[in-house]
Structure formats: structure tokens, C-alpha cells
From Swiss-Prot:
UniProt similarity note: Belongs to the RNA polymerase beta' chain family.
Chain residue ranges for the region called Disordered: 1378-1401
HAMAP family the record matches: RNApol_bact_RpoC
Enzyme Commission number(s): 2.7.7.6
Annotated GO biological process: DNA-templated transcription
Designated name of the protein: DNA-directed RNA polymerase subunit beta'
Organism annotation: Sinorhizobium medicae (strain WSM419) (Ensifer medicae)
Low complexity bias locations: 1391-1401
SMART domains to which the protein is assigned, alphabetical: RPOLA_N
General function of this protein: DNA-dependent RNA polymerase catalyzes the transcription of DNA into RNA using the four ribonucleoside triphosphates as substrates.
Highest rank taxon of the organism: Bacteria
Length: 1401
């Protein structure tokens, strides 16, 4: 009852609905229209009465009453006087909450520049006035006068005059001949007198005339700002303020502390400062004070307003009493603690609690154990309501008492309330969406939350003291979503790769693995069982053991559902697992008739999920978990020190390697190899030795041994744990029982002396010391990288947040070509893995039989993948989010399968956020895991090619010679060895490095795993193709070549040094020339002379006058020594790729096909030209720093996209030269390589979604008849819209090239300014948006979260869609009514709209 009465007097104002938010510069009139009165005094509250002072910063007359419906002097109290203004104190009688919304203002005695438009770079004021920021500051801060109207004097407009110069000018010309002003008034006058249309016209004509790039850019920037002002309706002089708004007092509160002191918001101090200076200035002007004093006061006023808006942006930071900088208005918005990120994007919520988690193995997958005390607190309101409804209590107070006393009926009611009411569990850090899942609560005693063991992987939780938070979804809709979308039973697959994530781990795996072992000569071997009853009986009586080889009948059903059975050779343990498998013709007994390692269990769950559906999978998982736990317990697997086996051959292997290392030392001492080569070889030798010891150890541990009775001995426990995937890796076993191997220094270099001992033997002091390096680096890395990884995720989410599935099909004919990824002869990602769940772009036919496998536009499913791989198809064109042509978001067909559901993706799925989480989540995982190996190093270098298929060799661009040893050597730069199968279909194609030894020739057959090429990974050779005598050119000792003698060996080597560093060497071009027997320079086969240019650091392998034959090495350039690769290099690498940074020494890529020619050299650059192969193409020239290792020779043929200079290519170059598809495959492969090294599987489509967001902008190359300027960066969508309207009017459309933006830049350039401002550089984004008068249409997720609406994804997306259709429908009906034809004709259109939401737009 009371509630209804209250509602009478306190009507809820209906919430404003709006579709967009616009931001612009406030004019003084606007500020006054917001204001409820001017603030004249700096006082806040009266220190005796604690009432606000009149006209002060908390004035009740301006801002409203302090208590609800009560004026300040107390004359009018209560509701009945609502709306009356008290004649004594002038306060309106109303709600006190108006103090949160009413604003005031301060009339400034002198105008003041707004610091954002002055100092936020690029400065808007200085760009508009076309003056430097320094000059404007001089005028604003009263250092110089500026001439605004020169009259007939010799002064120029906008000329700065110092005090003395001004005085002199006044003396010379007289005071009224010219006008010079100072301070913000001057800038105000100049801005107010600007004619924007005229300026824009002048700028455009000037741009057409100018030729210099720099000037063009400068004019363009200015033109852009001028046009922004014209379009937005802002006036330039509004950037100078004459009125300062004062925010409502309850947003800058003054709180009494105990002890009579007050805590105040910093803003009050800043406002007080402004008011004080303003009042003083007013008085000084009234008193006609001397100019210098007034100027000083004006300057101080300007500074205090600056501090109010953005403290510390200019000059000294204003500090409070305790030397702490005061928080200005800008600081309220900026950064992690600012309004956006602290209060709008991440709020704390009510109805939540947190506690420690413990394991709950007896729970079902959809349940969690909730402590009773916690549940009682969380569900209090529900309990009160139910107590009231059941008549246990009549008032809330009584209900409260009952609950506090914990009466028995309360517990019964709690049970009722909780039943079927899901709660959300969340474990921080929430790295992906599986970090929050819904469960049904089960009440438990104690104070710990019980968590189902199978969901630990998803939460990345363990039970060593982790805590989790519980949240209660309140509304019916929230409960529904929690149940339907977030329930743990609905999240069986991992959104990043589509593999099951509800997988047994640790104990469970060990138990299942133990259960599925098959041993020889066990009791009961060879028995046969017809059903499970017999089997259990035999096991009970110990007639047979779990691991015996038996024959058993497995009962299942066929496709029609009739029972069938078949006899398998298996073990009782496997039969027990088979008993749990759902009966389905597609889930054969073979899925569990094998050793159940973690991988196989995952595959088994995957099979069950794909064929039996979700419900069966959940039941199956629960039963598998129970089985795993019970058998892990019964097996009693444990290990002691004797389980770590040290191989007997270790001593010999170490001895051999030590001898080898001695030999390398000797070679180095004899000068046959350099220091660097020796280092590489030693490291290599020890690396191989470590591997060998590890292999021997594994062989020993794996070995099957029999006891005296001929029964197989039990398996080694450590091996069981590692092999099953329960705990421990071969690497850790190697350190326990093999040898620890090589260690890395913190810099990433490898220490030459390895650790020969293992942990069982114990380390020597030196070894221990060496190993501390790596271990400490691991710990330091972890701390640093966690932060970096989180930041990467944040940037990814920000760039991709508005990528949502908006349509079913965009109908594009573009796509990407997918092929298998082969690395070092191993297939790392088969074509099947890459195309599964994607949509085929073209029809896929079997190349031999010609039968159709997949129709174009259909999704490629598991059976299709098998067929495609069987048919030996090498490349498949698929649709991709990257090439999707929908304007906003992506379409379902281009995206393909929703990995977390295994079905085509739903409308409204937020695929951008999922992609960002999938890429960011492993980043953190990996960085947290670097140190487990204790910094054990691995050398990663490939030096050979192996055939990955059988078939016939075909060599593309064949260019080989036999050298003096009779071995074939590759002399071509773009030679590729292809392997064809018997049908002549290409199975693999691999490029061969220059100088490789080739062991096959055209037409040879190879078998799988056969080596067909190898090379030295540490040096790059320079070889001759003609025979003759060696001569040196410009090889001058001490200038271009240094002969260094190694002290320890007395051997000299000649190495090319940087010859440009000495004055005498600037014009040298060191080269080796081959002359024929007549003493003339030999001719090469392809034309040109046999002159080989040397690059810095090359080591000469020949002497002058030496005879050489084809294929001999003249010189070799060392490559840097192998550094170890781990994700530490990996995470920054991923960030570098997503930020699209140019690598430090980036590769130079050929822009056209053609022949290499050397031109005239510059001082320290070498000029390389490409003569185009086709006519009508301009030759391209490149300048290459002379010292760079440059391996092309005059006359080499090079293809478009080949590297002229090695290194990492810049992604922008790939985009410009080879196009979007090449860029996509480069970025996807490079990023995937980093993750693959760590064994993380991420689906390509996630990376493609992010790359799509990086390619949203276009740079205008031809403006056509549009208003764009060449060089403008515009949104792709915007350009398409403009072009459509231009073409409709019969005008010339504009053209542009796609631009690649890094993720930070792309996030800041989103169409939504709210989203950009909440990401980074808040002040800059808001300044820019205000000048341009931008409108935010609230299309992404972030903007909607910030303004507090449902996000336009998932269920929210559907609501938005319905709302949109409804408005369209209303408009249509109104339109029809207007025409006067009645509403009938609109109905068929509406029906069509309801069926196809896309049409409604």
C-alpha cells in the first residue's frame, strides 16, 4: 500500500530512449541555458551550521534542496509545498536528487582558451589560425602582442610583438593606426572573424597547385578541420570560453568525517581557485588597476581554468595540501580508474559472493556446491518474498528476524527458492567466455564452493586455494539465458578450436589409462566373455585381471536401431569403458579399444558429441569421470626415485660428444672454422646428445619386461603419468632421468657448456649456477608477460567488439585459398584441419573421378574432409570473414561453423569478441608457463628437406650445377622441388635455398621421409657458375677487408668489413671476379660478367689466383647464431603482427617481375633496378644500404613478391604488392606459427576476423567527383555509400586502396567515439569528436554497455531487430495512410519483412 501512495507523489520519469549520441562544442549560450544560476563566491558550506553558503559552490538556491522536500531555512517542509520557491532562502521545494543534475556557471571577466583545443595534439586552434602552438601560447599567456589589423603600417597581420616592440610601434605609427591585442581576447577576435567558406576554397585551390608532399599534407590537415567546423555547425570562437560551466554539487561532494574535518573532491579546490581569481580580476578592472597587474591576473585565471579542465597538461601541476596533484575533469574520465573503465564498463554488482573452491566429484556436470550460509545471504529477497507468501511472516521486518535466527522453515524455503535457479560462477582472471559459467546450486555444509572437476580446464582452476565468485541472475530473462546459453552442459566445446574442453585431466586420465592397458601373460589370457555380467563375475573371483588379453562381445545398435553385437580382442578394463559408451552405430567399440591417453579420451568425447548429441555426452562425461577417479584410486599408482631410470649408454654418449667438441675446438684452433661457427656446432652437438640420451631413457622406461613366471612386469609409473597425459612431459622426464642439457642466458643466447647431470644424480655447483640463469629469467618473464598478454587481449577485444554476425549470406564470390602447412617436411596443419567447418566457395570435385564432394556455398563437414583428403586435393577455396562484403559485421556463411556449438553460426553471435578472447587467452597461459622447464634451451634450425609424400620429383625453374665434389648444387633463387603422385597431381612443393645440395633430379621417385636437399643453416654461400681464376677487386687490407689472426690458433681469416667508415673507402666496391684463361672477365650464361659483389661480414674462402670450377664456394656470409625461440619472443611477435609494425630490418619486396640490374651507387646505398618482363611497365629501383647481406647478382630473374633483401616483410608492403589474400595468409601463418610452437590450437577464422577489422579503412587514390581529398583515410563502408550516390547521379566515383591499421590505431578510429574514448587517449578522442560534431549510432557492444542498454548481440540483437522492424512497419503504415490508400497494401511487405530481417534494414 505504502508503495502505491509514494508512487503518486514521486512519478517515475520514463527513461529517455535515444538512438544516437552527438557531441559538440558548447557555445556560451548553451552553457547558460544549462545553468540554474551564477556562482559568485568561492565558499562551500558554513563551518558552524554546515549549511551551504548562498551563491557559493554548494548553494541550495542554485542547485536545489539538501533534504527532500524541505527548503534551507525550514519554512516549507513536506510534500504539500512541492514546487514552491521559498521567499526567504530562495530554495525550490523538491527532491534533493536534483543536486545531481542541476548545473551552475561562472561568468569569466576575461575570455579563456579551452586547454583541450589548445594543447591536445594536433592543436585545433593553431591549425585553424595556421600559427605555431608556441606563438599562440605566447599570446595567450601574455608574453607577446599580436597584430590583428595592421592598417597602413609596415606591420604584418598575425605578427608577434614583444612589449618593447609594441611600445616602439605605438610611438612610431600612433596608437590608432593599427590594432595589436594580447591574451585570449586576441585569439577570440581572430577566430570570430574567420570566414570558413572562403578559407576552405583557398585551401582547395592551393592544394591543387602545390607539388610538395609536405605542404599538401599540411594543407589537408587544415582543410579537414575547417570542414569539420563547417559541417558540425560549431563556431571556432567557441574554443575560447567566456562562461565556465560548474558541475552539480553531488558529483563533487563534501563529506564530513568524524572529528569535524571534511573530505572534499579535488574539483571544489579547482573551482575555488577559478572563482577567487575571477572575482579578483573583476575588482581590479573596476579599480582601473595598472595594465600589468590586470594582465598578470588574466594569465593566472587562464592557468586556473586550464588546471580545472586538465591539470598538468600545461605548466606545473597544481597540488593540494598534501603535495598530491589535484584530479581535474579530464582525470575523472581517463585511464583505468576513470569514469569509462571503472564505472561504466566494469561495475561491481550486488547479489554476489566469493569463497575458496574445493573439488566436488560427486556432483553432476550441471551442478555446483553452494555453502548454505552463502546461499541464505544471496537469495535473501527471494526468501523474504516466499516467507511472506507462505504466511510465515507478515512484514519484511519479521521475515528478516526469521532469517537471522535461521529457523528450520527458512532452510526449507531456501531449498525451494534455489531449486532450478541457476547461479553464475566466475574465476578471475576471466580470459575467455568459459571463465563464467552457470550451474544449478546444491546446498552444502561448510564454507567452500564445490566445483565439478571436469570444468576446471575451462576455468583454468585448481584446488590449491583458488577463489571463485558467485553471482545470482535475478530477472527471468537472465535466468533463462544462464540456463540456455551459459550452463556448463552447453559449453562442451572450446570456442577457440572446437575441441572438447570438458575433458578428464590428471587423476581421471591416469585411472582410465590404467584401465585400458593391455599386458601379456596375465592370468585369464585368452578367455572369452559373452556379456558384462560374466566379466564382472570373473573379475570379482580374480579369474581374470583388468589387463588380460581376452575376447569379448560388445553390444551396440545398427543404423535402424536394432541390437547388434560383435566380438573384439580387448581387455576387461576396456570392456568396462565400452560399457559406458552410448549405443550408436557411429560410435564403434574401436573408440575405446585402445590405450586411453588424454588425446584419445578427447577424441572419444568429440566422437560421442558429434554423433549422440549434447545430453548423451554430458551423461557419458560424468560416468567417465567417476570411472577414472575410482580406478585411479584402486590402481594406487605412485612413484619413487627408482622409477627414474638413467640409461647406461649416457656415459658413452656424453663421452662421444665431448670428443666431438674437442675436435671442433681443434678445428677452430687450426682456423678451419670461425668462433661463431664453432659455437653453433658445439651447441648443435650437445643438443643432439641431449636428445639421444632422452631417447635412450624413454626406450628403457618403455621397455616391456617379464618376471620369472613369464608375466609382464607392471609399467613404469612415471612413464604412465607422462604418456597418458596426466602429468609431466617427456621434457621433464628428461631432466629427471636423462640429462638437463643446454641452458639459455637471460639474453636468449645458449651457454656452450651443458648440464650433463640430471636431477636424480644431482647437479654440481657450476651446473647449478648455470641453471639459475634460465630459472630466474622464467620467473621474471612470467611477471612481465602476464601484463603484456592482458593488454594484448584488451586491444584485440577493442578492435573487434563491433564485429557481429548480422546477416545470413552476403553472396560474395571472394574468398581465401587454403592449403596444408608444411614445415621442415612435416605437415603441421593438414588441409582438412584448416577447412573443417568453413563454407566452400567453389564446387569441390574429386580430380580423378570427377564426382562432386561439396557444392559451392555448403559447409564442409567431417565426412567431406575425409573425402577431400582421400582425393588428394591440394588447395580449396573457402569463404572467409576477411572477404565478407556485408557493410556492418560479418555474414553467417562467410564465418562458417560456430566452434563452440558445432553448428552453423547464429545470427547476432559476437564473433569479434570470441575471436579476441580466443587469441588473447592462450597468450596469458603461455606466458605463465615459460619457467617450468627451468630455461632448458632448444635449438630450432632446419637444414634439410624431406619428402612428406611418395611420388615423382619435378623441379620448377631448374638451375643446378655439379660442383667439384660431384654433388648437384642449386644455383637458382626461385627453384622449387615438387612431388607429383601417380596421377600427376602435385602433392607438395618446396622452395630450395640457393647453394643447397640436391640429391634428386627431374623424374626421380622419392619415398616418404627421404631427404632430397640439405644446406648449412649457419652460413649463406656465394658460388661461381663458371670456371676460371679468382681475382679480387677493391679488396684492400684494413679498409674493406680485415685479416684477423686468432691468438689461440695463429690462423688468419679474411672478413669483409664496413668499408664506408674510412674516408679512403667511400668509393670502393669490393668484389670477386672470375677470369678465363685469356685473362678476360668470364661471361655468365645469362649475360653479364662474372663479378660477385661482397657484402659486409662475408668471409672469403678463396685466394687470388686460385683456380675454381662450377659450383665452388667463393665466400660465405654467416647468419646470426641460433637463438632459442619461446613465447617470450612469441608474445611480442604476435603483438607486432597485430599492430602491423614495420620490422626493424624489414625485407624489401619486388613489386614487379623482371631482371635484376645494378645501377650507379650512391654514397652508402646500392642502387638495384628491376627491368620489367612485360612491356609498358616502368622499371622500379630500390636503394639498399651497402653493408646489408645482399645475395642477388646482376641478371637474376625475380618474380613479383620475391625478397630482394631478406628479413621479415612489412605487412603493408605485402598488402600493397600482393593484395589482401596474400596479406591474410601471411598474417595468419605467422601468428599461428607462434602459437603452434607452444602447442596451442586456434582456428584460423579468429585471426581472419581480427585482420578484417584492421582492413576497414581505405586511402583515397582518385577522388573522382566526391568531396574527398587524395590521401584521405576513410571508412570502407562510407566510401561505398558515397560512391553509390555518386554513380546514381551519373558522376565519377572515388577510388581507394585498402590500408592496414594496427589494432590500437584501428580501435581509435572506430566510427564510435564513445568506444574509442573508453579505450585510450580519452581527451584526444573526445576533442576530435567534439570539433567534428560526431554522432555515435551505438552500433558496437561497448557503446551500448556504456549507455546502459542491452548489447546488440545475442538476445539483445534480436530485440534490436524486432524494434527496428516495428519502427519500419509504423513508418510504412503512416506512409500508406498519407497516400490515402489505406493500410492494406503494406501488409504483404510487412509479412516479407518479418520473415527476412535483412530486408527491414
Amino acid at each position: 500500500m505504502n508503495q502505491e501512495v509514494m508512487n503518486l507523489f514521486n512519478p517515475q520519469v520514463p527513461a529517455q530512449t535515444f538512438d544516437s549520441i552527438r557531441i559538440s562544442i558548447a557555445s556560451p549560450e548553451k552553457i547558460l541555458s544549462w545553468s540554474y544560476g551564477e556562482i559568485k563566491k568561492p565558499e562551500t558550506i558554513n563551518y558552524r551550521t554546515f549549511k551551504p553558503e548562498r551563491d557559493g559552490l554548494f548553494c541550495a538556491r542554485i542547485f536545489g534542496p539538501i533534504k527532500d522536500y524541505e527548503c534551507l531555512c525550514g519554512k516549507y517542509k513536506r510534500m504539500k509545498y512541492k514546487g514552491i520557491i521559498c521567499e526567504k532562502c530562495g530554495v525550490e521545494v523538491t527532491l534533493s536528487r536534483v543536486r545531481r543534475e542541476r548545473m551552475g556557471h561562472i561568468e569569466l571577466a576575461a575570455p579563456v582558451a579551452h586547454i583541450w583545443f589548445l594543447k591536445s595534439l594536433p592543436s585545433r586552434i593553431s591549425t585553424l589560425l595556421d600559427m605555431t602552438l608556441k606563438d599562440i601560447e605566447r599570446v595567450l599567456y601574455f608574453e607577446n602582442y599580436i597584430v590583428t589589423e595592421p592598417g597602413l603600417t609596415s606591420l604584418k597581420e598575425n605578427q608577434l610583438l614583444s612589449e618593447e616592440e609594441y611600445m616602439i610601434a605605438v610611438d612610431e605609427f600612433g596608437e590608432d593606426q593599427f590594432t595589436a591585442m594580447i591574451g585570449a581576447e586576441a585569439i577570440y577576435e581572430m577566430l570570430a572573424s574567420m570566414n570558413l567558406e572562403k578559407i576552405a576554397g583557398d585551401l582547395r585551390s592551393e592544394m591543387a597547385e602545390t607539388t610538395s608532399d609536405l605542404k599538401q599534407k599540411k594543407l589537408m590537415k587544415r582543410l579537414k578541420i575547417v570542414e569539420n567546423f563547417m559541417e558540425s555547425g560549431n563556431r571556432p570562437e567557441w574554443m575560447i570560453m567566456k562562461v565556465v560551466p560548474v558541475i552539480p554539487p553531488d558529483l563533487r561532494p563534501l563529506v564530513p568525517l568524524d572529528g569535524g574535518r571534511f573530505a572534499t573532491s579535488d574539483l571544489n579546490d579547482l573551482y575555488r581557485r577559478v572563482i577567487n581569481r575571477n572575482n579578483r580580476l573583476k575588482r581590479l578592472i573596476e579599480l582601473r588597476a595598472p595594465g600589468i597587474i590586470i594582465r598578470n591576473e588574466k594569465r593566472m585565471l587562464q592557468e586556473s581554468v586550464d588546471a580545472l579542465f586538465d591539470n598538468g597538461r600545461r605548466g606545473r601541476v597544481i597540488t593540494g595540501a598534501n603535495k598530491r596533484p589535484l584530479k581535474s575533469l579530464s582525470d575523472m574520465l581517463k585511464g583505468k580508474q576513470g569514469r569509462f573503465r571503472q564505472n561504466l564498463l566494469g561495475k561491481r554488482v550486488d547479489y554476489s559472493g566469493r569463497s575458496v573452491i574445493v573439488t566436488g566429484p560427486e556432483l553432476k556436470l550441471h551442478q555446483c556446491g553452494l555453502p548454505k550460509k552463502m546461499a541464505l545471504e544471496l537469495f535473501k529477497p527471494f526468501i523474504y518474498a516466499r516467507l511472506d507468501a507462505k504466511g510465515y511472516s507478515s512484514t519484511v521486518k519479521q521475515a528478516k528476524k526469521l532469517v537471522e535466527k535461521e529457523k528450520p522453515e527458512v532452510w526449507d524455503i531456501l531449498d525451494e527458492v534455489i531449486r532450478e535457479h541457476p547461479v553464475l560462477l566466475n574465476r578471475a582472471p576471466t580470459l575467455h567466455r568459459l571463465g563464467i559459467q552457470a550451474f544449478e546450486p546444491i546446498l552444502v555444509e561448510g564454507k567452500a564452493i564445490q566445483l565439478h572437476p571436469l570444468v576446471c580446464t575451462a576455468f583454468n582452476a585448481d584446488f590449491d586455494g583458488d577463489q571463485m565468485a558467485v553471482h545470482v541472475p535475478l530477472s527471468l530473462e537472465a535466468q533463462l539465458e544462464a540456463r540456455v546459453l551459459m550452463m556448463s552442459t552447453n559449453n562442451i566445446l572450446h570456442p577457440a578450436n572446437g575441441a572438447p574442453i570438458i575433458v578428464p585431466s590428471q587423476d581421471m586420465v591416469l585411472g582410465l589409462y590404467y584401465l585400458s592397458i593391455m599386458n601379456q601373460n596375465e592370468p585369464g589370457e585368452g578367455m572369452a566373455f559373452s556379456d558384462m555380467g560374466e566379466l564382472h563375475h570373473a573379475l570379482e573371483t580374480k579369474a581374470v585381471t583388468l589387463h588380460a588379453k581376452i575376447r569379448g562381445r560388445y553390444k551396440t545398435v545398427d543404423a535402424e536401431g536394432n541390437p547388434v553385437s560383435k566380438i573384439y580382442e580387448t581387455t576387461p578394463g576396456r570392456m568396462i569403458i565400452g560399457e559406458l559408451l552410448p549405443k550408436n552405430p557411429n560410435v564403434p567399440f574401436e573408440t575405446c579399444n585402445q590405450e586411453m591417453t588424454k588425446k584419445n579420451i578427447s577424441k572419444m568425447i568429440d566422437t560421442v558429441y558429434r554423433h549422440c548429441g549434447q545430453k548423451d555426452t554430458v551423461i557419458f562425461c560424468d560416468r567417465i569421470m567417476q570411472l577414472g577417479f575410482s580406478h585411479a584410486c584402486r590402481a594406487g599408482i605412485s612413484f619413487g626415485k627408482d622409477d627414474m631410470v638413467i640409461p647406461d649408454t649416457k656415459v658413452k654418449i656424453v663421452g662421444d660428444t665431448e670428443a666431438l667438441v674437442k675436435e671442433y675446438e681443434q678445428q677452430y684452433n687450426d682456423g678451419l672454422i670461425t668462433q661463431g661457427e664453432k659455437y653453433n656446432k658445439v651447441v648443435d652437438a650437445w643438443g643432439k646428445a641431449t636428445e639421444k640420451v632422452a631417447e635412450e631413457m624413454m626406450a628403457r622406461i618403455k621397455a616391456v619386461e617379464f618376471d620369472d613366471s613369464g608375466r609382464q612386469k607392471p609399467m613404469n609409473s612415471i612413464y604412465m603419468m607422462s604418456h597418458s597425459g596426466a602429468r609431466g612431459s617427456p621434457n621433464q622426464m628428461r631432466q629427471l632421468g636423462g640429462m638437463r642439457g643446454l641452458m639459455a642466458k637471460p639474453s636468449g643466447e645458449i651457454i656452450e657448456t651443458p648440464i650433463i647431470s640430471n636431477f636424480k644424480e644431482g647437479l654440481t655447483v657450476n651446473e647449478y649456477f648455470n641453471s639459475t640463469h634460465g630459472a630466474r629469467k622464467g620467473l621474471a618473464d612470467t611477471a612481465l608477460k602476464t601484463a603484456n598478454s592482458g593488454y594484448l587481449t584488451r586491444r584485440l577485444v577493442d578492435v573487434a567488439q563491433d564485429c557481429i554476425v548480422t546477416h545470413t549470406d552476403c553472396g560474395t564470390d571472394k574468398g581465401l585459398t587454403m592449403t596444408a602447412i608444411v614445415d621442415a617436411g612435416q605437415v603441421v596443419a593438414s588441409i582438412g584441419q584448416r577447412i573443417l567447418g568453413r563454407t566452400a566457395l567453389d564446387n569441390i570435385d574429386n580430380p580423378v573421378t570427377g564426382e562432386r564432394i561439396v557444392d559451392a556455398g555448403r559447409m564442409i563437414l567431417e565426412p567431406d574432409v575425409v573425402a577431400i583428403e582421400k582425393a588428394g586435393i591440394q588447395s580449396v577455396r573457402i569463404r572467409s570473414a576477411l572477404t565478407c562484403e556485408i557493410q556492418t559485421g560479418v555474414c553467417g556463411v562467410c564465418y562458417g561453423r560456430d566452434l563452440a556449438r558445432g553448428t552453423p553460426v547464429n545470427m547476432g553471435e559476437a564473433v569479434g569478441v570470441i575471436a579476441a578472447q580466443s587469441i588473447g587467452e592462450p597468450g596469458t597461459q603461455l606466458t605463465m608457463r615459460t619457467f617450468h622447464l627451468g630455461g632448458t634451451a632448444t635449438v630450432v634450425d632446419q637444414s634439410f628437406l624431406e619428402a612428406s609424400y611418395e611420388g615423382t620429383v619435378q623441379i620448377k625453374n631448374r638451375n643446378m650445377l655439379r660442383n667439384s665434389d660431384g654433388v648437384l648444387v642449386a644455383m637458382g633463387r626461385n627453384m622449387a622441388i615438387q612431388i607429383l603422385d601417380e596421377r600427376g597431381v602435385e602433392r607438395s612443393s618446396q622452395r630450395v635455398a640457393y647453394g643447397s645440395k640436391i640429391f634428386v633430379d627431374d623424374g626421380d621417385t622419392v619415398r616418404r621421409g627421404q631427404r632430397f636437399a640439405e644446406w648449412d643453416p649457419y652460413t649463406r654461400p656465394m658460388m661461381t657458375e663458371v670456371e676460371g681464376t679468382v681475382h679480387f677487386e677493391d679488396v684492400v687490407d684494413g679498409i674493406s677487408v680485415l685479416e684477423s689472426t686468432d691468438e689461440s690458433t695463429g690462423i688468419t681469416k679474411r672478413q669483409v668489413i664496413d668499408w664506408r667508415s674510412t674516408p679512403r673507402g667511400t668509393d670502393l666496391k669490393p668484389a670477386i671476379v672470375i677470369k678465363d684463361k685469356n685473362g678476360n672477365i668470364a661471361k655468365l650464361a645469362r649475360g653479364g660478367e662474372a663479378r660477385f659483389m661482397l657484402s659486409v661480414d662475408a668471409i672469403l674462402s678463396v685466394e687470388p689466383g686460385q683456380k675454381v670450377s662450377q659450383g665452388d664456394v667463393l665466400a660465405r656470409s654467416p647468419l646470426e647464431s641460433a637463438k632459442t625461440k619461446d613465447i617470450t619472443g612469441g608474445l611480442p611477435r604476435v603483438a607486432e603482427l597485430f599492430e602491423a609494425r614495420r620490422p626493424k630490418d624489414h625485407a624489401i619486396i619486388a613489386e614487379i617481375d623482371g631482371t635484376i640490374r645494378f645501377g650507379r651507387d650512391y654514397k652508402n646505398k646500392r642502387r638495384v633496378m628491376i627491368e620489367p618482363a612485360e612491356d609498358g611497365v616502368e622499371p622500379v629501383e630500390y636503394l639498399i644500404p651497402k653493408g646489408k647481406p645482399f645475395h642477388l647478382q646482376d641478371g637474376d630473374y625475380i618474380e613479383k613478391g620475391d625478397y630482394i633483401l631478406d628479413g621479415n616483410p612489412a605487412p603493408h608492403d605485402i598488402l600493397a604488392i600482393k593484395g589482401v589474400e596474400a596479406l591474410a595468409s601471411y598474417l595468419v601463418n605467422e601468428i599461428q606459427e607462434v602459437y603452434r610452437l607452444q602447442g596451442v590450437v586456434i582456428n584460423d577464422k579468429h585471426i581472419e576476423v581480427i585482420v578484417r577489422q584492421m582492413l576497414q579503412k581505405v586511402e583515397i587514390t582518385d577522388a573522382g567527383d566526391s568531396t574527398y581529398i587524395v590521401g584521405d583515410n576513410v571508412d570502407r563502408i562510407e566510401l561505398e555509400d558515397v560512391n553509390d550516390s555518386l554513380i546514381a547521379e551519373g558522376k565519377k566515383p572515388a577510388f581507394g586502396d585498402p590500408v592496414l591499421l594496427g589494432i590500437t590505431k584501428a580501435s581509435l578510429q572506430t566510427p564510435s567515439f564513445i568506444s574509442a574514448a573508453s579505450f585510450q587517449e580519452t581527451t584526444k578522442v573526445l576533442t576530435e569528436a567534439a570539433v567534428a560534431g560526431k554522432t555515435d549510432n551505438l552500433q558496437g557492444l561497448k557503446e551500448n554497455v556504456i549507455v546502459g542498454r542491452l548489447i546488440p548481440a545475442g538476445t539483445g540483437g534480436t530485440m534490436t531487430q524486432i524494434r527496428r522492424i516495428a519502427t519500419a512497419r509504423d513508418e510504412l503504415i503512416l506512409e500508406e495512410r498519407r497516400k490515402g490508400t489505406g493500410a492494406e497494401s503494406a501488409t504483404p511487405m510487412l509479412a516479407a519483412m518479418a520473415n527476412d530481417p535483412a530486408a527491414a534494414e
